């Protein structure tokens, strides 16, 4: 079986980003992005997805975090698409419900080749510490567009905004883990009646 690893760099006038990931890792995360709360969330992807994820970013955070957050999502999406390859033998679909105290979120993903984000998180605060909660949409939209996935994200309940988004990222990691798992019954087959994704 081929290694499912990828390294992608993205350089613009706003950000310089490097992402390395291993889809068959142990859940190790290394982050140096200048956006600490996003690093905390990406660590949930690594740990709950059993994905080794190394992300570095130098961005124009003296303006705000928008460019860094969006471009990190884009670059992780590009690395994901590269590591997944032609999708032969994977389960394709993944889903997870994750609670954290009063908060509960559901994430459903399809490695369909068709980018789509449907996201409903009724945040109880506009900021978590210094982090603008609107930027989570930018992160996931960047990821979806470049990974070529359909992603449904719903926070079903929650009072604490930190708990709300942490359950989302944990569920995202777990849904990735399920969707990317190799199914021995599929062998080298494409998980689609069309024969292609």
Curated annotation (Swiss-Prot):
**Top EC category:** lyase
Superkingdom, according to UniProt? Bacteria
Tell me a GO biological process for this protein: L-histidine biosynthetic process
Please tell me where this protein is predominantly located: cytoplasm
User: Cross-referenced Pfam families, in alphabetical order?
Assistant: IGPD
For this UniProt record, give its keywords in alphabetical order, as a comma-separated list.
Amino-acid biosynthesis, Cytoplasm, Histidine biosynthesis, Lyase
Give the Gene Ontology MF terms in alphabetical order: imidazoleglycerol-phosphate dehydratase activity
Q: What is its EC number?
A: 4.2.1.19
Enzymatic reactions:
D-erythro-1-(imidazol-4-yl)glycerol 3-phosphate = 3-(imidazol-4-yl)-2-oxopropyl phosphate + H2O
Q: Name one GO cellular component term.
A: cytoplasm
Q: Where in the cell is it found?
A: Cytoplasm
Pathway(s) this gene product operates in, as recorded in its UniProt entry: Amino-acid biosynthesis; L-histidine biosynthesis; L-histidine from 5-phospho-alpha-D-ribose 1-diphosphate: step 6/9
Instruction: Show the PANTHER family listed in the entry.
Output: IMIDAZOLEGLYCEROL-PHOSPHATE DEHYDRATASE, IMIDAZOLEGLYCEROL-PHOSPHATE DEHYDRATASE HIS7
Q: Which NCBIfam families match?
A: PRK00951.1-1, PRK00951.1-5, PRK00951.2-1, PRK00951.2-4
Give the family per the record.
Answer: Belongs to the imidazoleglycerol-phosphate dehydratase family.
| Name of the protein in question | Imidazoleglycerol-phosphate dehydratase
Q: Which organism is it from?
A: Saccharophagus degradans (strain 2-40 / ATCC 43961 / DSM 17024)
At the highest ranks, the source species' classification is: Bacteria, Pseudomonadati, Pseudomonadota, Gammaproteobacteria, Cellvibrionales
Recorded name of the encoding gene: hisB
